[in-house]
UniProtKB/Swiss-Prot annotation:
The lineage of its organism: Archaea, Methanobacteriati, Methanobacteriota, Stenosarchaea group, Halobacteria. Disulfide bonds: none annotated. GO terms for molecular function: rRNA binding; structural constituent of ribosome. It comes from Natronomonas pharaonis (strain ATCC 35678 / DSM 2160 / CIP 103997 / JCM 8858 / NBRC 14720 / NCIMB 2260 / Gabara). Gene3D superfamilies: 3.30.300.20, Ribosomal protein S3, C-terminal domain. Residues 207-305 are annotated as: Disordered. It holds the Pfam family KH_2. GO terms for cellular component: cytosolic small ribosomal subunit. Residues 207-262, 272-305 have a biased composition (Acidic residues). This is Small ribosomal subunit protein uS3. HAMAP family: Ribosomal_uS3_A (MF_01309_A). Residues 17-86 form the KH type-2 domain. It comes from the Archaea.
Length: 305
């Protein structure tokens, strides 16, 4: 069988099984099914408002359903699991069957529609829509819609988020089709967004190295050492530290005073300025000695003459 025909065959088989359950389990509150084919057989999960009625006394009803699925629909080793619906008012199939039964019992369509959609919204649904089509009143068919909240009609969210169900009400004038769409409370819509507040960044604190016990013992050891030291030694150490600080302060003050006396920025030490004066004095003394020697020589020459 080609792939296209296989898809058509599987879809048709699934629709036929769904219609079978809807007719067979209408009084039990049929709420839909899930079919999964595995190598061990076909796994079917039924959702019902009253699971006890689906199973039957001693499992009689569930065995009958299993035999029918295997013989009429050709399913290999069907395994049926029944689950109870937590909130029937949020299951579109159950709501559609209830509304169809209310119309068959003689409820006015507007009262039935508004009452049903109000119960859906009170259960926490984000949105709901009910469509009644057929001979609602009179001989002419028409369409009546009831809307509440937010509903998606197309796109991927309409298939994955919206829960839909259909029902049929058989009236004297003709049939009325019932279509129900519900968006459950936990649905995440694609256009929803959330604004987060700014996160306060805390200062980075380095984690201390070592075990917790070692970190707790370290302060105790330091305190023990300080307590065990002699008071006299502690006083001597303090006085020595104070004396060193005083000497350092005096040196700083002396240096500042010298700088103020010598000028803003001395380029050479004081000894370097005195050296040229000493050289000049030596030259003057040498010249004076030479003059004295010349004068003595002149006097000696005069005496000889």
């Amino acid at each position: 069988m080609a792939d296209e025909h296989q898809f058509i065959h599987d879809g048709l088989q699934r629709t036929q099984i769904d219609e079978f359950f809807s007719e067979e389990l209408s009084r039990a509150g049929y709420g839909g099914m899930e079919v999964a084919k595995t190598p061990m057989g076909t796994q079917i999960v039924l959702k019902a408002e009253k699971p006890g009625m689906v199973i039957g006394k001693g499992g009689k009803n569930i065995r009958k359903i299993t035999t029918t699925l295997e013989e009429e629909f050709g399913l290999e080793d069907p395994q049926v699991d029944v689950q109870e619906v937590d909130e029937p008012d949020l299951n579109a199939q159950i709501v559609a069957d209830r509304l169809a039964n209310a119309l068959e019992r003689g409820w006015y369509f507007r009262k039935a529609g508004h009452t049903t959609i109000d119960r859906i919204m009170e259960s926490g649904a984000l949105g709901a829509e009910i469509i009644l089509s057929g001979k609602v009143t009179g001989a002419r068919s028409r369409v009546e819609k009831f809307n509440r909240g937010y509903i998606k009609h197309n796109g991927e969210p309409a298939e994955s988020i919206v829960d839909s169900g259909v029902g049929t009400a058989v009236m004297k004038l003709g049939t009325i089709g019932v279509q129900v769409k519900i968006i459950p409370p936990e649905a995440e819509l694609p256009d929803d967004f959330e604004v987060y507040e700014d996160i306060e960044v805390e200062d980075f604190v380095e984690e201390p190295e070592g075990d917790v016990e070692e970190l707790l013992e370290a302060p105790e050891d330091a305190e023990a050492e300080s307590v065990g030291a002699d008071p006299e030694e502690v006083i001597e150490e303090e006085t020595e530290a104070e004396a060193v600080e005083e000497v350092a302060e005096e040196e700083i003050i002396d240096e500042e005073g010298v700088e103020a006396e010598t000028g803003d920025a001395p380029t050479s030490p004081p000894d370097a300025a005195e050296e040229p004066d000493e050289a000049l004095d030596e030259d003057v003394e040498a010249e004076a000695e030479e003059l004295l020697d010349e004068m003595e020589d002149e006097t000696t020459d005069e005496e000889e003459t």
